[in-house]
Amino acid sequence: MKLINIGFGNIVSANRLVAIVSPESAPIKRIIQEARDRGMLIDATYGRRTRAVIITDSDHIILSAVQPETVAHRLNTKEQDGNETDEDSVTQ
């Protein structure tokens, strides 16, 4: 299982991520409010400004204080590390 640090020691399963988006647009604000109403919102900002909204395959919405680009970079780094590990295990 691949895990991604989304800030302040909070970690999310990379396999469950559907999208990482900015919270600025009206549709995303609406998604956040709907998730809050349904009890499916996870606020991992520790009171700081929300900079990334993470949408999971279970319809949970996670708020993060880390930039979407940073989360995506961490995800890509994990995937590259995983690919190298997979290749190494095949050749051994």
Swiss-Prot record:
Residues 73-92 are annotated as: Disordered. Residues 82-92 have a biased composition (Acidic residues). PANTHER family: REGULATORY PROTEIN SSL2874-RELATED, REGULATORY PROTEIN TM_1690-RELATED. Belongs to the RemA family. NCBIfam families: MtxBflmRegRemA, PRK04323.1. This is Putative regulatory protein Ccel_1792.
